Amino acid sequence: MSQPDAAYEVFNYTLEKNITIDAPVNNAGFGDFGNFWEVDAQRQTDLLQVNIMTLVQLTRYFLPGMVERRHGSVLNLSSVAAFSAGPRMCLYYASKEFVRSFSEAVAEEVRSTGVTVTALCPGPTATGFEQAAQMKNSHMFSMFKPASAAAVAEAGFRAAQKGKTLRYCGWPTHTVSIAARLLPRSVCRRFMMKVNG
């Protein structure tokens, strides 16, 4: 998914095999840990491609057919990270804020078409993300008990089926999203700096 033509290859495969997609789930993504200027530049480019561009392109390729059929749901994986700046994981947090905002906007655009778009915003999830992002100095997974991947998937499925635009997973995630809106942004940034180590 980190290649610029990855989304087109997926879309073209469905055309070649005559597969109709009416419920795409855009859940590919990854994070990286460290100060912005110290993280590998190619890894940062790949993160932006996977977390933002491929998700946008897949949505763009599949949405017209869904709108034409007046049926379907798009489920985009955002994160509780979408509600705050994330020092030491700045591109990941920014990418998830993009996904949330993008999903909400497109959801409104398609509101009268029979198609829904849902942004799923889980907190820490037991998927191997922590190891892949090299978060050994982060306190995120020790401060917040990770949800199971199955529970997050179930929450996303149910939200998409109900046509929800935004879905939080669990009370800690909902609490963090509320706190991020009520507290000064400087307080949120400092808190996330401590959480991220």
Give the residues covered by each predicted segment.
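The beta1-alpha1 cofactor-binding region of Rossmann-like NAD(H)/NADP(H)-dependent oxidoreductases
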Residues: 1-9, 41
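Conserved NAD(P)H cofactor-binding loop of Rossmann-fold oxidoreductase domains
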Residues: 27-32
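Substrate-binding pocket helix/loop in short-chain dehydrogenase/reductase
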Residues: 35-36, 43-45
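Active-site helix of classical SDR
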Residues: 59, 95
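Residue(s) in the substrate-gating loop at a strand-loop-helix junction
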Residues: 79
